[in-house]
């Protein structure tokens, strides 16, 4: 996705989009894991919402100019009242390998009933 880290990226826009996607995936993964641990975990707060100066680091959701980053939308989806999440422990499954992935369908404290 990112290519070699020994040289300057040839396409800075693509590099930025990929890095923002990875930031959002990390936050989404953490938030979903925390929600699956309800009520052992009381909740999660994003430490820093916005950036104090123009930069390309940190876990914030809004950039210095007030524009929402990719992570904003991934976090927003992870906090939806009805959001299915997989409990996966690795991303290195082999082609054709069988595995079981438990999932959770949290409903913001409301019981879930099949129709």
Regions inferred by a protein language model and the residue ranges of each:
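Substrate-binding clefts and catalytic carboxylate motifs of secreted carbohydrate-active enzymes
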Residues: 1-99, 104-112
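Terminal RNA-binding accessory module
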Residues: 115
């Amino acid at each position: 996705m990112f290519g070699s880290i020994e040289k300057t990226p040839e396409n800075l826009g693509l590099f930025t989009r990929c890095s923002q996607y990875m930031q959002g995936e990390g936050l989404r993964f953490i938030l979903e894991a925390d929600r699956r641990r309800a009520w052992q975990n009381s909740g999660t707060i994003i430490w820093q919402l916005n950036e104090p100066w123009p930069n390309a680091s940190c876990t914030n959701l809004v950039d210095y100019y007030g524009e929402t980053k990719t992570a904003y939308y991934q976090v927003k989806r992870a906090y939806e009242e009805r959001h299915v999440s997989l409990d996966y422990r690795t991303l290195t499954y082999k082609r054709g390998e069988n595995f079981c992935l438990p999932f959770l369908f949290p409903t913001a404290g409301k019981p879930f009933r099949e129709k």
